[in-house]
Design a protein with these regions (language model features):
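Exposed loop and linker-edge segments at protein-protein interfaces
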Residues: 121-150
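Hydrophobic alpha-helix/coiled-coil detector that fires on Leu/Ile/Phe-packed helical surfaces
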Residues: 60-62, 71-79, 100-106, 139
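C-terminal motif of bacterial Sec signal peptides marking the signal peptidase cleavage site
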Residues: 24-27
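Post-signal peptide N-terminal segment of mature Sec-exported envelope proteins
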Residues: 36-59
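Short beta-strand/loop micro-motif enriched in small hydrophobics and charged residues
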Residues: 79-117
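Bacterial signal peptide processing site
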Residues: 29-32
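Bacterial N-terminal signal peptides that target proteins for export
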Residues: 3-16
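Hydrophobic helical h-region of N-terminal Sec-dependent signal peptides
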Residues: 16-22
Length: 151
């Protein structure tokens, strides 16, 4: 009788294969359970009475996007509200916006009216008050998060 083909060895080989399959399936299940339940980098909350959203990002999302900010100011030559041109975001209808940063990791889109562009500075006839923190780098990503659009 061939020792490899004995019923006892076949049973043992079958048990070993079954054990490997069971352990492999259990390992896959553990990987799926280890994934975070809510891994969203951004949480949206409606701003009551508007069509706007308050966007709260995780610390990791802020770092990954590389958000940078500046403050609105009053232009000393014109007396007009001014903001870095890099803060201005144009939507698909041509309307102009900035994202304000009212508190750490929180961003809210606000409409602005650009009167004119002077180099790297946008002079505004309407917008957030002087001293308001606005996003200068990463506004497009915030817009994408707000409207759930892929980049």
């Amino acid at each position: 009788m061939n020792p490899i083909a004995s019923p006892r060895r076949r049973t043992l080989a079958g048990l070993v294969i079954a054990a490997f399959l069971a352990l492999g399936a259990a390992g896959c299940a553990q990987i799926q359970e280890a994934a975070p339940a809510n891994g969203d980098p951004a949480v949206l909350a409606e701003v009551p009475g508007t069509d706007l959203h308050r966007i709260t990002l995780t610390e990791h999302a802020v770092e990954r996007v590389g958000l940078k900010t500046d403050v609105t100011a009053v232009d000393p030559q014109t007396g007009k509200l001014s903001v870095s041109y890099w803060a201005i975001l144009y939507d698909s209808t041509g309307k102009t916006w900035v994202y304000t940063n009212p508190e750490p990791r929180v961003y809210v889109r606000q409409a602005v009216t650009v009167e004119r562009i002077n180099g790297a500075v946008a002079l505004l006839s309407d917008g957030p008050a002087a001293g308001t923190v606005v996003v200068t780098t990463g506004a497009e990503e915030l817009y994408g998060a707000e409207f759930d659009t892929a980049h």
